[in-house]
Amino acid sequence: MKSRYAVRALTELARRQEGGDGKPVRLADVAESGEIPLQFLEQVFATLRRAGVVRSRRGAAGGYALARPAEEISVLEVVTALDGALSPVECTQGLCDRAGRCGASSVWVEAQQALAGVLGGTTIGDLLAREEALRGRAPMYYI
């Protein structure tokens, strides 16, 4: 759940910073837009700050900003910062004593590699572009 909220919040942060002056965005605004509990988001962003994904500024004009362009922050980086290494099962971490004789272990390793490939090849910038495209295709209602 942390990763899901974090990706949603980072995409919103990228949207608010897009074409802007790089000023920090209040986390309360991001939480409200993303429908994420503020206290939870504060904990998530503290971890993301330590991981170098976001930067923060204190004070009246404070808030958070992406530490790098959205196109340089992969979803995999966010997930591993919050949840650790991707491991659907223990044997992908080398912790299974049956790995050398288990037919399923290679399947789990392939699944892990595929997931890492998708998440590593997708950036916050990509997600923002996808959301903007979806919004552009939304039906318009006129009164």
Give residue ranges: language-model regions:
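Beta-hairpin "wing" of winged helix-turn-helix
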Residues: 52-66
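A short alpha-helical element within helix-turn-helix/winged-helix DNA-binding domains
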Residues: 24-35
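Short, hydrophobic-biased segments on the C-terminal half of alpha helices
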Residues: 45-46
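C-terminal regulatory/oligomerization modules of transcriptional regulators
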Residues: 75, 95-143
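Short amphipathic alpha-helical elements of helix-turn-helix/winged-helix folds
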Residues: 8-19, 81
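Alpha-helical residues within the helix-turn-helix
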Residues: 32, 49-50
